[in-house]
């Protein structure tokens, strides 16, 4: 039985771990991020991968920082055949990668060499890509730079957001990994070096990027909103109040009003201006301190005072 140390943290990694278990790989240990405080009550919560590992009685290692930790020494001493990572979230020391008797591989959520880094799915949506995918690569010291063993593509549509693409790529990555690992173990897998001229990066989304730019064309604004959904949410300042836009629909009609202005408003509909004289319909939003609301609930509640012609979204709170 081939032994594995698995590293992963979010829901994306759970089907991959479950797939390895179902295919009778011997999971010696699971390494995941430490429990974190979540929610308004800041309750300590285990990562999805930890919860999955505990269901199968697999030992769990949770170093705050892997490099130099007792958990690192413990994992190296296990001398696994394979190290498999999927969205773990920490730098892996070279001496740990070299502890694998066969190889250390990563399931990466993009079509490498495009979008190395921690937020490939968000950037693929944000940039309006027509497709994304997963790549199985060898883990090396340089981030996401190892040789590629396999890729699988996934079309992207306007119905997608980061949540839906995460779920789809998780299953696609699981299947591709389970198809590729036997070839790697047998020494028959083909290695393809990454083209350095085609490398792009997808650094972790910053707090500043959560502030939506109302001067973007409506189509691009929609892409940003979907890239930040469902976990974070992008916000604007609407009448000076921080308001999250969870869903909009770009429209074909244009307007000469300034970006952030209301073009049309009734009890059930709110149409606004974005950049380059484009327009969009607001479908779902969330005023500060309140729950998500349909646009009808908002217009008949907190947004009753909004009227056509007003410029209500500004770059900064007034």
From Swiss-Prot:
This is Methionyl-tRNA formyltransferase. Keywords: Protein biosynthesis, Transferase. One of its GO terms (molecular function) is methionyl-tRNA formyltransferase activity. It holds the Pfam family Formyl_trans_N. (6S)-5,6,7,8-tetrahydrofolate binds at residues 110-113. It comes from the Bacteria. It comes from Lacticaseibacillus paracasei (strain ATCC 334 / BCRC 17002 / CCUG 31169 / CIP 107868 / KCTC 3260 / NRRL B-441). Attaches a formyl group to the free amino group of methionyl-tRNA(fMet). The formyl group appears to play a dual role in the initiator identity of N-formylmethionyl-tRNA by promoting its recognition by IF2 and preventing the misappropriation of this tRNA by the elongation apparatus. Its EC number is 2.1.2.9. SUPFAM superfamilies: FMT C-terminal domain-like, Formyltransferase. CDD domains: FMT_core_Met-tRNA-FMT_N, Met_tRNA_FMT_C. Coiled coil: none annotated. Belongs to the Fmt family. It catalyses: L-methionyl-tRNA(fMet) + (6R)-10-formyltetrahydrofolate = N-formyl-L-methionyl-tRNA(fMet) + (6S)-5,6,7,8-tetrahydrofolate + H(+). HAMAP family: Formyl_trans (MF_00182). GO terms for cellular component: cytosol. The gene is fmt. It is an enzyme of class 2 (transferase). The keyword Transferase applies.
